Design a protein with these regions (language model features):
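A short Gly-Trp-Pro
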Residues: 1-124
Length: 124
């Protein structure tokens, strides 16, 4: 999809986050306190990213997952804003999803910290 098509498909906030690597305000997203069973998908291309059983409450204000579907998420070094982080993007379309940190649950020690507006949801 080109920029014009994306701007028609996405809300201004979804575009800012997924295409310009923005971050939504903590505790503002619709999936922060979302607990339905199903699949979280990329808002841009629809690729399945995170099963609902991998979601946990990290207390950070953003939807957090301890693992992604294998091959669904790419990890990219991010040194913006003077920080050393790892950006996560949709491996299909390159949409910015958030960041992954090594402070998650005991099983994986990963916290995929995502922006709600970069996600969609398909219930089981």
């Amino acid at each position: 999809m080109n920029k014009s098509e994306l701007k028609k498909k996405l809300t201004p906030e979804q575009y800012r986050v997924t295409q310009e690597k923005g971050t939504e305000a903590p505790f503002s997203g619709k999936f922060v306190n979302h607990h339905e069973k199903g699949m979280y998908t990329c808002i841009v291309c629809g690729r399945p990213l995170f099963p609902s059983n991998t979601k946990f409450d990290s207390g950070t204000g953003w939807p957090s997952f301890d693992k992604a579907i294998p091959g669904a998420v790419s990890q990219v070094p991010d040194t913006a804003h003077g920080m050393n982080r790892t950006e996560i993007t949709c491996s299909n379309c390159g949409a910015h999803l958030g960041h992954v940190f090594d402070d998650g649950l005991i099983d994986t020690e990963k916290r995929f910290c995502t922006n709600s507006c970069s996600l969609d949801f398909t219930p089981d």
